[in-house]
Amino acid sequence: SKSAWSKTIEAADEAYMPGTFTTFAGYEFTSSTLEREALHRNVIFRGTERMPALPFTRFNSINPEGLWNWMDKMREQGIESLAIPHNSNGSNGAMFMFTDWEGKAIDQEYADQRLRNEPLVEITQVKGTSDTHPLLSKNDEWANFEIFPLRTSTKLLSGPPGSYVRN
């Protein structure tokens, strides 16, 4: 809602202490489905002087390409942002698919748009690493660092292809 979004922006402004504590106004965009688990992105804005009236959410579209289109339109209006994919190790291969959302081959336009809007990726957090997996990096002695096979005592059925940055 506008009220919750306004409060998010206000909280970022109130907590900001130049040179001591940096805050960002942002939110989490989730586009998970039963087939595409754990598709989370943190969307962070540069400054709070120019902000969208409301964030782009799964109510607008669950397709991350829709998020990127929206971010590009916001950028044309002087509103800078970036999306940071995270928890890709739990995406069941959907975070870094070799096709677009609709199954079409990735082309240069897709790659450019994704890089423009998602220049960073979260590598490691409490839910495990999203860097690589021993099945993907057989010669990397550190590939088994923080592999997280369980989620809430349930086996994590996320396959390595498409779930890790170094795929």
Model-predicted segments: where are they?
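Extended, charged catalytic domains and RNA/DNA-binding interfaces, predominantly
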Residues: 1-167
